[in-house]
Structure formats: C-alpha cells, structure tokens
Curated annotation (Swiss-Prot):
Disulfide bonds: none
Alphabetical list of Pfam families matching this protein: TATR
Protein name: Trans-activating transcriptional regulatory protein
Function: Regulatory transcriptional protein, which trans-activates gene expression from early baculovirus promoters. Can also trans-activate its own promoter, suggesting that it is autoregulated during normal infection of insect cells.
GO biological process, one term: viral genome replication
Region span, Disordered: 106-133
UniProt keyword list: Early protein, Transcription, Transcription regulation
Similarity section: Belongs to the nucleopolyhedrovirus IE-1 protein family.
Transcription regulation among keywords: yes
InterPro entries hit by this protein: TATR
Length: 560
C-alpha cells in the first residue's frame, strides 16, 4: 500500500473533528442548490482514474494541508466566538442579580447583590464564587406546578367547577367542531408567529384613566402602554386626581379617580387606605394609590363597565398578534357560535370550595357538625362577668399587643375568652375543647348565624379560616343578642352584606386595616385579646372606639 494511503482513505470519509460547542449543530444541512448528481459523477471519475505513486503522494499531502488549514480556521473562529460570548454575556434586562456564594467553614451562605462596578478587586472576590444565571420572568402571576401529587380523600368539601355545558359536550366540540377547521387552516408567515409569541410573553401594562367628564358622568381614557404604571400616572395624570384606586385585570390597569368614586355615590370600604382631603390638598404633586380587590373591585368593574374595556383591549391585541388569516377564521367561528347560542357553552369555569350538600328538601335543614357541636357544648357556659377596670383601660394597648401563646385553634380561643382575665385556669369551657374546627366557607357562616340569631341568652363563638395558604380569618362571638365580628379582607365573604341579613341583632364589627398578611394574623390575635376584655366587661365599647381612632391604629370599629 502506498505511503499515507490509510490517511487518504480516512480523509475521504471523515473531515477534521467538529468542536464540541452549541454554536455547531450535530446534524448536517445541505444547501438547497447542491447537485448530488455532479458529486456522484465527480466521485466516480476520481475513483476510476489510476494514479502513479508520486501523484498519489502529492494528492495526499495536498489534502492533509487543506485539512490542517481548515482545522486552524475552525479553531480560530471558535476561540473568537467563545471570547465574544464571555465578554458580552446575557443582556442586562434578562439578568437577575448576581448570586454570591461565600464559603464560611463548612457552611454555605447565599446572598443576592447588585453589580456596583464592572470589576471587583482580588481581595473582594477571594473566597467567593459568582454564579450568573438568566432570569425567567413570569407573566403577571406566578403559578407553581407540583412535581408530585397524591390522591387524598376529602369527606366534607369539594371544589365545585361550574360550567354551562357538560364536560363531554365541551370535549366533543373541540374534537369535531373546532379541530377540523385548524387542519384546513394555513399558517401565516413567520412574522405573525413572532408577534403572537411576543404578545404572550409581554410584561407591560395597558393603562386606562377613569375620570370625570364635562359632558357625561365619567369617561375612560386610554393613557399608554408602559412598564411602570405609577410613574406614568404621577408624571402625566396627577392633575386628574392624586388619589387613585387601581383595578388590575391581568395586563390592563384602570386608574380610577377617588373623587369620581365618591361623587358617584359608591360605598368605599372603611379599610381602604387613602389619605384624607387635607393631606391630598397639601401635597398636590404626591399621588396615592390603593389597589382594590374582592367585592369593591367587583363594584368598580360593574359601575364603570371596565370588563368591556378589558375584553375589547385583550381581544383586539390578541387578534392582531395572530394575523389576518387565523383571526378571520376565529371571528367567523365565534359569530356562528353566537348565532346558534353555542358560544355560551364554552368551558368558562368558576371554582369555589363549598360543602358537598345536595339541594334537596332533606338537606335544606342540614347543619354542619361544626356548628352543631358549638351549639351543643356551649349551652351551659357563660363569659365571666366583671366591672370596668380603670387599670386595664389605661394599659389597653399594652395588654392587647403583648406577646402570648394564643393560637387559632378552637380550644385555645375558648380558653382565652372563657377564662377570667388574670386567671387562666379559671374557666367553665372544658366542654368546648371537644369542638372540632372545620375550614371556613360562606354556608358555615350563614348556618352559625341562623342557628343563633333567635337565641337571646347563649354565649359562644366560631373561628373560621378561608383560602388555604392565604389564611384569611373570621371570628364571630355571640353574647346574648350581640355579635362581635373580627375580620380583615376576605375574598369570598362580604361581612357587611352578611350583617345586613340579621337585623334582629346588634353587630360590632372590628375590621383589620393597613397591614400585610403576616401582620393581619398578628392583629387578629390582638383583637381576640381585646374581645376577651370586652366580653368580660373589663372595658367599654367607648374605650374600644377611642383606641380604634388613633392615627396609627391597625383596625377600625363600627356598630351595625
């Protein structure tokens, strides 16, 4: 065999090794204008030509030289690309702050810090590891997908999914009435696909301003598409009203004028945290924003027709991002479904956790075991009676806010309310420790109230938790014909509306305000301690009213 023949045979079928880097694809793509017939002819011609030993050696040397040159070029390009990528890194807007890992003994300490300079000194970086990773920014709302779930049995409650049409009909629609149109649909150009992808991943907000109008009761004006809503309003719309209710509907923000809401006669919840008129006038360039939710949000949406503005904005922007062809298909299909009324059987679902009770004649008089136990075990118990104590009244704030071992278990609250103040073991509520607490819902509240509203002598209470992780709490205590309510903002319960149903009784409502979730839990316990003093007559309602009127108070009181 001629010299270097083995190398020649290998070079005919394998080129220089491809660098292992993500810039180079493992698959091979051929140009569209590549003529395989010419390649085959050239290969057959080359294989049929007989060469002398010297000519073969010259060809081998030439191929090896070209292979070496190609290898050098590839390595050079790879080195330049790697260096460029190292210097450039990720874009600034996709980076999250550096994560510095400090090694201290055998423990690892992590902390996030911002980049204060382009480079760090050798001493500052000694013993530290910098880990830079891209930040995946969520859109509007974080949603966690569990890695593992288990099937659990829940006897008392289920999550009711309400749909207009049965599930099998909805599945049939998507299988036969919708998918067949998609198979005939031609995809739009790549530009339309990019627009839809950008629309879905967009994190900005469409801002609308709801304000007074000279010619009509109010008007809703589109302001701008921005990333910072409060800055946009403060810079350009502060003259409309420097007190604003913010209604957030996904990526649409409605900035509703406080003055407009008040002039329209809409009831503003007492827990809303906005400055008074005097402060707003003293600082006209300072804007105050109050995010609204739950019942008050529903009221504003309904009164100012914000659902229509949101739907039109979302629908138009979505159709624009999908392109003309697909949008036309959807519009035609939606119009047909509107005409035959099948549009309203789409899977629009609302979920609410309620007891699994059928609406039958036998179940209408149903009482939950929780309420039944409260009524049963509280028949012969009474809150301790005392006379107003000036020493307690003068130290009211100190007593209410001091730390205690109180928990939100029924037995713990019973021990607090029925134990004589200052004598923890002196109580007549041992029987109440048998009560088994249940998760809260609207039906439980109504059952408790209906079972107690006509009883003018009993003393008892109920503690309820809503929302799972959110831990929204509601406590109702009964003393004769009076009910005492302790609550913050609860998503599924409107305390004021519930109170209005039971006009035979006197209702004292303690509403927690101006606090976050953790502080709300703390202040619920504080108000339970306040309730103990009130139920045992150690303080008067006037003392509670005076305490709630303090400037830094975390709750408000009202009698209904």
């Amino acid at each position: 065999m001629p010299k270097n023949m083995a190398a020649l045979q290998q070079s005919l079928y394998t080129g220089p090794s491809t660098p292992s880097h993500t810039q180079f694809s493992r698959s091979t793509e051929f140009p569209e204008n590549l003529n395989f017939d010419v390649l085959n002819d050239s290969y057959e011609t080359f294989s049929s030509v007989s060469l002398t030993t010297a000519e073969q050696d010259n060809q081998i040397d030439k191929i090896l030289q070209e292979s070496a040159a190609m290898n050098r070029d590839v390595n050079s390009e790879l080195a330049q690309f790697t260096a460029s990528e190292y210097v450039t890194g990720f874009r600034a807007d996709t980076m999250e702050p550096e994560v510095i890992v400090e090694t201290i003994g055998d423990s690892m300490k992590r902390k996030a810090s911002e980049l204060d300079s382009d480079s760090d000194s050798g001493e500052s970086s000694k013993g530290k590891k910098r880990v830079i990773k891209p930040k995946m920014r969520q859109r509007y709302k974080k949603a966690t997908i569990q890695n593992k779930t288990s099937l659990t049995e829940e006897c008392n409650y289920n999550t009711e999914i309400c749909t207009v049409a049965p599930t099998d009909q909805i599945a049939e629609y998507f299988k036969h009435d919708f998918s067949v149109y998609l198979e005939k649909q031609k995809s739009d150009c790549q530009m339309s696909a990019n627009r839809f992808s950008d629309y879905i991943s967009e994190t900005g907000y469409y801002v609308f301003v709801v304000k007074k109008s000279e010619h009509k009761p109010f008007e809703v004006v589109f302001a701008k598409f921005v990333n910072n809503v409060t800055n946009e309003y403060t810079n350009n719309y502060y003259m409309v009203d420097n007190r604003v209710f913010v209604v957030s509907l996904n990526n649409v923000k409605f900035m509703v004028s406080y003055k407009l809401v008040r002039e329209q006669g809409i009831d503003i919840p007492p827990h809303v945290n906005l400055c008074d008129d005097a402060q707003a006038e003293r600082n006209p360039y300072d804007c105050y924003f109050e995010p609204v939710k739950n019942v008050f949000q529903t009221t504003l949406i309904n009164h100012f027709h914000l659902d229509m503005y949101y739907s039109q904005t979302t629908f138009v922007t979505l159709m624009q991002s999908m392109g003309e062809s697909k949008s036309g298909m959807l519009l035609n299909k939606l119009y047909q479904m509107f005409q035959d009324r099948s549009l309203f059987t789409l899977p629009i679902m609302l979920s609410r956790k309620e007891p699994t009770i059928e609406n039958t004649p036998l179940s209408r008089n149903y009482t939950s075991s929780y309420v039944a136990q409260i009524i049963k075990y509280s028949k012969n118990v009474r809150f301790p009676e005392n006379n107003p104590d000036n020493g307690v009244i003068s130290r009211l704030e100190e007593i209410v806010t001091q730390k205690s071992s109180l928990t939100y278990k029924y037995s713990s609250v019973a021990n607090l309310l029925f134990s004589r103040y200052g004598h923890q073991r002196d109580n007549n509520a041992d029987s109440l420790k048998k009560v088994k607490k249940e998760d809260g819902n609207r039906l439980l509240v109504e059952q408790y109230m209906s079972q107690n509203e006509n009883d003018e002598t009993s003393h008892n209470f109920i503690v309820l938790q809503f929302g799972g992780v959110n831990d929204e709490r509601l406590t109702i205590a009964k003393k004769g014909i009076e009910f005492f309510w302790i609550a913050a903002e609860i998503k599924d319960i409107n305390v004021d509306d519930l109170v209005k149903k039971y006009t035979r009784n006197v209702h004292h409502v303690f509403r927690i305000i101006n606090v976050n979730r953790r502080e709300s839990t703390t202040w619920h316990n504080n108000l339970l301690k306040l309730l103990q003093l009130l139920l045992q007559n150690l303080i008067r309602i006037d003392d509670v009213q005076q305490y709630s009127n303090k400037g830094d108070s975390k709750f408000i009181y009202k009698r209904l």
